[in-house]
Each structure stands twice: as structure tokens, then as C-alpha cells.
């Protein structure tokens, strides 16, 4: 995923009790998924669309009461439902419980990063591999306090939030943490110092997960031939699923449609 600023730094601090080595062990020990060479894998493509009227709470206006020189004046519009020309942005799509397939690609710059810049989390949504992640403060003179929580029970509609890490970051630079979900790949982030800063992540055990593009489209490539459950997650509207059959070297097209009805 594209991030603001470079994704590498030679002097990241380590926060909390889990080290980078422990994060690497989390990578190697991800139960239930085996990396293999995929010969003639297929591709799942599609698009997320939204139909009907937007919900009344699609955009929330929250007053900016701290650091106006960096965060801006007045209020922040938090866009919970981002629809452009019918495309539903800020959505995730992933294969459920795939047992084997392609290896994870290296993240841009060599590290997964959550950047805090202009009092915004950048990016708003991203897929990360469980393990090390850099929490970056790019706002000089601004104290940020990231709270990263595993969302348990999303698919049942009864969400319990388990904090993975929550700490203040008063100075610009990077702090290394560890993304280590116990029961759910769905993750929310917010800033305890600025109540208008939010974002989302997914941290699945396998790399067959993506965030949809600005036009609502997606592509999951190099999928071994077979039949799978494909799931879609929008943080406001929840989870949809469908069965897909992937052929060797072929494209499988899937459409997800959300609405308030």
C-alpha cells in the first residue's frame, strides 16, 4: 500500500515487550497456511459498489480542539462511508482460510508503516502481515497516542475490542511495535489525543487480501486453482461472502454491492 513518506528508517525505537525477532516468529509460525510455488495461478477480480441513499452518519464532523496549526481549524470531516461514482472505497476483500499459496511480498520500503501526518493516519486502510510494524509520527510538536485494537466478533455483529498496543508518541520518528492478532484479522486504530483520527487494518495469516482501489476495483492474483470462500469487509457495513471457483491462469469476476436497505 502506498504511504506518505519513506517506509524505512535506521533508528526505529522498540516499544512494548515484543521484539522484532518475536514478530518474525509470528510470521514463521502462522498456523494453517503454507507458502508454495504457485504454477499458473488464477486471479480474482471485481468491484465494490454502493446502491441507494448514503446513511445519515456517512460523514461525521468532529471539532478540532488540539494542535490547530497542524491539524487544521474548525472541524474534521471523518468519512465513514466513502462513495465516488458508485464505488465503495475503504473496503477490504480476502480469501477465507486458504491453506497454501503464494508468499508474502515485501512491503514498500521494507517495513509496514502507520504514519501520523497532518493529524491523519496514512493510509486510512491497509493490509499488513502479522509481525513488526513501524508507528511513525511526522507531526513535529504534536503528541499522538495510537490505540490499536483487534476487532473480535465482526462477522457476528457483536464486536469486542482487544487492545494490542496503546502508547503516546510525543516526538517525530518511528517506534516499532508488533501486530499480533489472537482471534481476528480485523483491526481498528484511533488516536487517544485527537478524537478525529481513525483508520483500519487487516492482518490475515496469508497474503490473499487487498484494499480496494479508488474506483472500488480489486484484484487478488496468483491464486491456486480451487474453490474458496471470498469475503468482503467494510468497517461500517460489515462482512459479505460468496463462493468462488478459480481456474488455472484464468480470471474470476466477483461483484460486491452494499446498501443501507
Can you describe what each PLM-predicted range is?
Residues 2-261:
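Extracytoplasmic copper-binding redox domains, predominantly the cupredoxin/blue-copper superfamily
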Amino acid at each position: 500500500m502506498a504511504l506518505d513518506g519513506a517506509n524505512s528508517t535506521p533508528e526505529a525505537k522498540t516499544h512494548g515487550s515484543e521484539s522484532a525477532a518475536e514478530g518474525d516468529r509470528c510470521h514463521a509460525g502462522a498456523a494453517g497456511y503454507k507458502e508454495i510455488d504457485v504454477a499458473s495461478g488464477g486471479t480474482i477480480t471485481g468491484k465494490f459498489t454502493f446502491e441507494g441513499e448514503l446513511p445519515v452518519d456517512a460523514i461525521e464532523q468532529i471539532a478540532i480542539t488540539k494542535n490547530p496549526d497542524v491539524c487544521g481549524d474548525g472541524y474534521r470531516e471523518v468519512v465513514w462511508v466513502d462513495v465516488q461514482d458508485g464505488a465503495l472505497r475503504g473496503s477490504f476483500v480476502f480469501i477465507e482460510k486458504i491453506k497454501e499459496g503464494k508468499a508474502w511480498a515485501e512491503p514498500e520500503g521494507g517495513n509496514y508503516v502507520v504514519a501520523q501526518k497532518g493529524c491523519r493516519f496514512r493510509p486510512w486502510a491497509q493490509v499488513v502481515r502479522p509481525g513488526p510494524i513501524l508507528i511513525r509520527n511526522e507531526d513535529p510538536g504534536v503528541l499522538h497516542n495510537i490505540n490499536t485494537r483487534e476487532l473480535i466478533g465482526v462477522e457476528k455483529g457483536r464486536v469486542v475490542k482487544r487492545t494490542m498496543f496503546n502508547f503516546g508518541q510525543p516526538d517525530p520518528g518511528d517506534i516499532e511495535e508488533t501486530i499480533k492478532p489472537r482471534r481476528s484479522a480485523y483491526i481498528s486504530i484511533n488516536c487517544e489525543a485527537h478524537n478525529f483520527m481513525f483508520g483500519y487494518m487487516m492482518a490475515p495469516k496469508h497474503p490473499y487480501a487487498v484494499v480496494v482501489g479508488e474506483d472500488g476495483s480489486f484484484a487478488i492474483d496468483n491464486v491456486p486453482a480451487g474453490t474458496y470462500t471470498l469475503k468482503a469487509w467494510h468497517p461500517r457495513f460489515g462482512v459479505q461472502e460468496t463462493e468462488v471457483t478459480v481456474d488455472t491462469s484464468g480470471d474470476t469476476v466477483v461483484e460486491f454491492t452494499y446498501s443501507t436497505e
